[in-house]
Amino acid sequence: METYPITIGKITRHVPVVETLPGVHIPLVEIMGDVDLVQAAAEGLLKHLPPETDALLTLETSPIVLAHSISALCGKPYVVVRRKRRPYMQDPIIQEVESLTLGVSETLWLDSRMAEKLMGQNVALVFDVVSSGGTMTALEKVAKKAGANVVARLAAFHQGNSKLPVTFLSEIPILQTA
């Protein structure tokens, strides 16, 4: 199996290269379960967290561990936006997003009770990997609908040509094959 080296701080991993679309391969970064990599990313991103940040905003599933680790380091709360509607949700904020990297459209959901926690807050968006920027753009729209002000866009890894200004720790390629 072909692998690609990724590094955050002093932590290096060799991750598998997978095909996402015909002729397009990416290093598959899955941070869940890798405590050392998550901790290194949290420590690295914490250095870029603006002092005016009140809360972190992330989405399920993979970036939760990163947001949790940053939260534990800085004492700021975090809110998780869901990728599926949950039965308990009341009057949720709904935002469509298309992930160009994986070619799959999805919907983001934020329960109104969670949205209330963001009202008037300065939030930092936390991601594991940002590629096209489509999902992060949708998350920013959720934050604004909830009445929050986005003060930072943070990601452990950046991949591709996102036009968004994102603070990231490491770059990973999109590999094209003929």
Name these PLM-found stretches.
Residues 54, 121, 151:
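Conserved acidic residues
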Residues 5, 137-178:
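PRPP-dependent phosphoribosyltransferase catalytic core
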